[in-house]
Amino acid sequence: VNIDHVATVRDARGTSYPDPLIAAKIVKEAGGDGITAHLREDRRHIVDQDIGRLKQQNILPLNLEMAVTDEMQKIALDVLPNAVCLVPEKREERTTEGGLNVSKNISSLRSFIEPIKKKHIRVSLFIEPSEKQIDAAKSIGADIIELHTGYFCDLYENNDKNYIEVIKTIEKAAKYAFKLGLEVHAGHGLTTGSVGYISKIREIKELNIGHAIISDSIFMGLGGAIEIMKQKIKEARLYRA
């Protein structure tokens, strides 16, 4: 469960609440498997103290989303999260808009992740469902890829039937990465409506979902929103090919 938007609500008024740490505890109680938090360069929601406290309390495994910068590398090496997920980042974007271009940055990314891996932190790369990017991720020593599901979700939410072809592309990419020995995750834009399509893909081990869960929690509580999302995932996995 991505808890960024708990911090977004906090930042709207500049208060000390709601506390992402309390959210993490509820995530665990509701059956969540881990916590994802994106420490952006502009600190627009999650801040350094949140990351430190989440790791110190060790409520659930911590996946730190971050840009490929010297500052973020230092923070990861200091905090020692269970995993880092490297994402592209632009200050003007509302949320991450696309996957990391690994194939164009092989040398620099390999150098960037080397000290992180030496600290036994698992490295994930947020990428588009492309064999070219998957090959590049494998070549630099990534442990995990997270497939960007945003385009699929946009089509699905707008009732555009082209989402069916995009799902096929995601499934093909997941199978390809799995055969290469990469662990496969997926995320971005998933809702209770769209999550089933991704959950049916056998090779995808983990889903990172945040905005939809936090949105639903306004009406049904955070625990209830997590439980419903998990149920949707479980139902879809029963019908895997």
Where are the model-predicted features located?
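Hydrophobic faces of well-ordered beta-strands that scaffold small-molecule active sites
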Residues: 1-3, 35-37, 62-66, 84-86, ...
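Conserved N-terminal beta1-alpha1 strand-loop-helix module at the mouth
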Residues: 2-64, 74-81, 136-139, 162-165
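Active-site mouth loops of central-metabolism enzymes
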Residues: 2-20, 61-68, 95-103, 120-129, ...
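Surface-exposed amphipathic alpha-helices with a cationic face
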Residues: 28, 52-56, 110-120, 138, ...
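C-terminal helical cap(s) of enzyme catalytic domains, especially alpha/beta-barrels
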Residues: 55, 98, 157-163, 216-238
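Catalytic cores of alpha/beta
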Residues: 70-79, 130-140, 186, 190-204
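Glycine-rich phosphate-binding active-site loops on the catalytic face of alpha/beta enzymes
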Residues: 85-93, 144-157, 203-222
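Histidine/lysine/aspartate-rich catalytic loop segments that bind and position anionic ligands
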Residues: 122-176
